[in-house]
């Protein structure tokens, strides 16, 4: 029990150090397959009005199929507050192809884009063929002619893929609507669940459940495996689980603290935290040879490692300066540099893929905000105005 409390304090960013707050955390981990719930996120508009887009119900005899697809596309495109979706009741026409689309009809609604399409059934395979189109009203041109072939069971996935193409065509940025979220639930006393779901909270699946705490889940780079910490055997153990087979393996660990596993970008290593030498330090685990290398050695608490995109550096949290701050260590030279200097609490850092920026939790006036910082530059930028923000991670499209 004492060890569990120590580890919980460690993993959750030193929130019990120099504090008397009790904080509830929600950790969400993202992975893209190219491949909650009940959490409502309210996003307000910025200073610029978002593009207005109409999603016309696709032409098909079975309206339930049509509305399943178009409603899902509408929900996806409105998920981040980047678009204003026009209500179906405000539509002035219901085109299904470029041949029956008239741009002047839509200019009266002050609309930027229209999505329309039609569905047919492939009789020999019973698969749906979805032809969909994206029209730019301002420029008066057809931006996208897309075709999706889908079974009835995969219509939702197809709608996510269509949303990705539409989103990228408009913004120039890859869509992330096929992304999966991984998170831990504690629905009742002595019950913990490690779950994944679609980015909108649908299709929830429990990967592992236990009467003992589960912590620190992380995706492998290829999305085929996950790592996490479980207390199921009375001690903190790091497990790797294969998502297709469900097979679980416990890594060779010492008694004491074993926490915060994170995958390297090539999938060959896990960085993690262990107290095997008497104090929590960062270690590297070679998944092929099972060799363990010590990365940091300090009397302070080192935790929450994160790999840079090139795999040559680790970002980690340490209180070696007296308060939780972010540090960077070269895996080649073992040289350690302090990264953050603003305030007395900066933790849970993650690199952006460009290697030039990091995102992390910053405390200001006893409030916790998601912030970003450019490496090598002074200062930071707070992204959120709420008070108990935790566990940031970068989206698969780096946006």
Regions found by a protein language model. Give the residues of each.
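Short beta-strand->alpha-helix linker/helix-N-cap micro-motif
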Residues: 42-104, 115-118
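Hydrophobic beta-strand positions that form the internal "hydrophobic ladder"
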Residues: 181, 226, 267-270, 311-315, ...
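Amphipathic beta-strand/beta-sheet edge segments enriched in Tyr/Trp
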Residues: 39-40, 98-165
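A flexible loop/linker signature enriched in serine peptidases of the S9 family
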Residues: 174, 185-193, 211-212, 229-237, ...
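Residue-level detector of Asp-centered blade-edge/turn motifs that repeat once per structural unit
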Residues: 176-177, 221-222, 265-266, 309-310, ...
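Short loop/turn segments that connect beta-strands within beta-propeller blades
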Residues: 138, 198-202, 242-246, 286-290, ...
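A short beta-strand motif characteristic of beta-propeller blades
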Residues: 203-208, 247-252, 291-296, 335-340, ...
């Amino acid at each position: 029990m004492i060890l569990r409390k120590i580890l919980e304090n460690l993993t959750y960013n030193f929130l019990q150090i120099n504090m008397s707050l009790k904080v509830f955390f929600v950790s969400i981990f993202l992975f893209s397959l190219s491949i909650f719930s009940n959490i409502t996120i309210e996003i307000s508009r910025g200073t610029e009005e978002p593009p207005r887009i109409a999603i016309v119900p696709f032409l098909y005899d079975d309206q339930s199929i049509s509305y399943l697809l178009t409603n899902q596309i509408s929900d996806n495109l409105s998920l981040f507050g980047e678009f204003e979706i026009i209500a179906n009741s405000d539509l002035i026409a219901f085109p299904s192809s470029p041949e029956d689309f008239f741009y002047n009809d839509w200019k009266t609604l002050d609309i930027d884009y229209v999505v329309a399409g039609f569905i047919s059934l492939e009789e020999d395979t019973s698969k749906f063929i979805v032809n969909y189109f994206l029209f730019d009203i301002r420029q008066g041109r057809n931006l996208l002619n897309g075709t999706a072939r889908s079974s009835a069971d995969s219509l939702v996935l197809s709608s996510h893929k269509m949303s990705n193409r539409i989103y990228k065509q408009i913004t120039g940025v890859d869509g992330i609507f096929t992304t999966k979220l991984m998170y831990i639930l504690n629905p009742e006393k002595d019950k913990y669940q490690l779950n994944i779901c679609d980015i909108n909270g649908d299709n929830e699946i429990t990967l592992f459940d236990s009467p003992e705490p589960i912590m620190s889940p992380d995706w492998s780079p290829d999305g085929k495996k996950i790592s996490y910490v479980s207390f199921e055997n009375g001690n903190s153990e790091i497990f790797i689980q294969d998502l297709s087979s469900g097979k679980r393996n416990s890594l060779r660990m010492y008694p004491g603290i074993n926490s915060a596993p994170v995958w390297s970008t090539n999938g060959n290593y896990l960085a993690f935290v262990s107290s095997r030498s008497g104090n929590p330090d960062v270690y590297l685990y070679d998944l092929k040879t099972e060799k363990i290398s010590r990365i940091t050695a300090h009397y302070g608490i080192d935790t929450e490692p994160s790999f840079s995109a090139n795999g040559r550096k680790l970002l980690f949290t340490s209180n070696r300066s007296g308060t939780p701050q972010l540090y960077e260590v070269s895996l080649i030279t073992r040289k350690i540099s302090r990264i953050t200097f603003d305030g007395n609490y900066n933790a849970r850092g993650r690199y952006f893929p460009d290697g030039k920026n990091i995102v992390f939790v910053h405390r200001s006036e006893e409030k916790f905000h998601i912030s970003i910082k450019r490496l090598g530059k002074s200062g930071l930028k707070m992204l959120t105005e709420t008070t108990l923000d935790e566990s940031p991670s970068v989206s698969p499209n780096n946006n």
